[in-house]
Amino acid sequence: MAKLHDYYKDEVVKKLMTEFNYNSVMQVPRVEKITLNMGVGEAIADKKLLDNAAADLTAISGQKPLITKARKSVAGFKIRQGYPIGCKVTLRGERMWEFLERLISIAVPRIRDFRGLSAKSFDGRGNYSMGVREQIIFPEIDYDKVDRVRGLDITITTTAKSDDEGRALLAAFNFPFRK
């Protein structure tokens, strides 16, 4: 079991119970899932780019990504409906906790010119979204084998009812928010 999951059960639940005066432990917000999305718009011209992006996402998450397809045709971007334009992975359970642990302790500190994550990236319902400009911050990616630096979106979905609860949950995990 991931250390972060044990830490959540032992420390974070108690801390949030006292902070928000919950009656039951089931009211305490928890991390539901983490979604990693990598948009590869250049895949229209070269299908190999999408395969490389999928391989990177597999290395980062430990799970085979789902290839996302265009929902509708857009002439300006030269895409048609059904064209493969990206890939995504949804992490739950043990893999989710392990990824969150690696993200907080290893990947985020390796971001170039890092001054903290924005605390304003909550959606109003306690879910947090962040963008990463380079996939090479993850230790699983071999820098020499990278064909192109790609970014990815990371969405942390929680059971929190408000942004304050979601922010308190992630802050309890020592998320490096900007002051």
Curated annotation (Swiss-Prot):
Belongs to the universal ribosomal protein uL5 family. GO terms for biological process: translation. One of its GO terms (cellular component) is ribosome. HAMAP family: Ribosomal_uL5_B (MF_01333_B). This is one of the proteins that bind and probably mediate the attachment of the 5S RNA into the large ribosomal subunit, where it forms part of the central protuberance. In the 70S ribosome it contacts protein S13 of the 30S subunit (bridge B1b), connecting the 2 subunits; this bridge is implicated in subunit movement. Contacts the P site tRNA; the 5S rRNA and some of its associated proteins might help stabilize positioning of ribosome-bound tRNAs. GO terms for molecular function: rRNA binding; structural constituent of ribosome; tRNA binding. It comes from Pectobacterium atrosepticum (strain SCRI 1043 / ATCC BAA-672) (Erwinia carotovora subsp. atroseptica). Part of the 50S ribosomal subunit; part of the 5S rRNA/L5/L18/L25 subcomplex. Contacts the 5S rRNA and the P site tRNA. Forms a bridge to the 30S subunit in the 70S ribosome. Signal peptide: none annotated. This is Large ribosomal subunit protein uL5. PROSITE patterns: RIBOSOMAL_L5 (PS00358). InterPro entries: Ribosomal_uL5, Ribosomal_uL5_bac-type, Ribosomal_uL5_C, Ribosomal_uL5_CS, Ribosomal_uL5_dom_sf, Ribosomal_uL5_N. Keywords: Ribonucleoprotein, Ribosomal protein, RNA-binding, rRNA-binding, tRNA-binding. Pfam families: Ribosomal_L5, Ribosomal_L5_C.
